[in-house]
Design a protein with these regions (language model features):
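Intrinsically disordered, low-complexity regulatory regions of eukaryotic regulatory proteins
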Residues: 3, 20, 51-52, 71, ...
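Amphipathic repeat-derived elements
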Residues: 15-33, 119-157, 198-206
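SAM cofactor-binding core of SAM-dependent methyltransferases
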Residues: 41-136, 140, 145-152, 181-184
Length: 287
């Protein structure tokens, strides 16, 4: 078989093989969702999040009746390919929200000068995070009391940054954190602080879900969902607890262990131009 013949066969077979794999993947998720004891998992959908976080977040906001607001996301870059094009708050930007992104790596977006989204490049640690937060809020003309959603995912010192946010007086309606699913409840684990830490792929990173549940309880937050890949946990302020009476009370019925890298692309690949479009501030027509 010549090289050209092999290439022709490959080009014809690859789409069919990929489609078959996608169908198997969807069946895998459908089965997991059908077995979930948490009704919020049934709302999970991927649009611009890494996994099913978009759908879960939108359902939470629908329940607490927040249509417009402000977000604050720390850790929006996922490596070489997804620097600012795959994270938890893009969907909120597209719904008309305003927000702030912070990451130690530049994003692959060319944001307009007048933007609903402001990005700040900063590698955060306990010593610089408060100043970075306050500078970002001031430049974005947003008060910390106006932040509705916070998301933290930095693959390392997540707890120490999360702790700083809450101690600084942030009280978002919904707080999303990446947890370390390697440690099931009731295991308590929190990575020792290292201001220069960079994740190298091992399980020494972040916190166990039980550690986070115990911590957030001190600040008036309740765990309502873990996404189905065992990546992110959603905490909602107790002032909204009546909206989540159908959510399991036992952490073991909410926890998901790691089941990473299964979600397939939904629709066409993400374009930076699309996100830049939604970041533009458009003047409303005069009445």
């Amino acid at each position: 078989m010549s090289g050209n013949e092999f290439l022709t066969i490959y080009k014809n077979l690859f789409p069919l093989m990929k489609r078959h794999l996608d169908m198997l993947t969807l069946r895998h998720w459908d089965k997991k969702i059908s077995l979930s004891k948490n009704v919020l998992n049934k709302s999970g959908m991927k649009f611009y999040s890494q996994n099913d976080e978009d759908g879960i977040l939108m359902e939470i906001l629908n329940r607490i009746n927040i249509k417009q607001g402000n977000f604050f996301e720390i850790g929006v870059c996922g490596g070489l390919k997804n620097n600012g094009t795959e994270c938890n708050t893009i969907i909120l930007l597209m719904l008309g929200w305003n927000g702030i992104w912070i990451d130690g790596v530049n994003i692959d977006l060319d944001l307009p000068k007048e933007s609903k989204l402001n990005f700040f490049k900063q590698f955060l640690n306990k010593d610089n995070c408060i100043k970075t937060f306050n500078d970002a809020l001031e430049k974005s003309k947003i008060n910390k009391s106006e932040i509705n959603v916070v998301s933290v995912d930095i693959d390392g010192n997540d707890f120490y940054i999360t702790e700083s946010i809450l101690k600084e007086g942030f009280q978002p309606d919904c707080f999303i954190v990446e947890y370390n699913g390697k440690f099931p409840p009731p295991i308590i684990y929190n990575m020792p602080y290292d201001e220069n830490y960079v994740w190298k792929g091992g399980d020494e990173q972040g916190c166990s879900l039980q550690f986070y549940v115990n911590f957030f309880d001190k600040f008036g937050y309740n765990l309502v969902c873990c996404n189905i890949t065992g990546t992110n946990a959603f905490f909602v302020h107790n002032k909204h607890k009546d909206k989540f009476k159908d959510v399991p009370k036992d952490i073991k019925d909410i926890f998901y262990p790691p089941d990473y890298n299964w979600f397939t692309q939904i629709g066409h690949s993400t374009s930076a131009k699309t996100i830049e479009h939604f970041a533009k501030i458009v003047d409303k027509p005069k009445k």
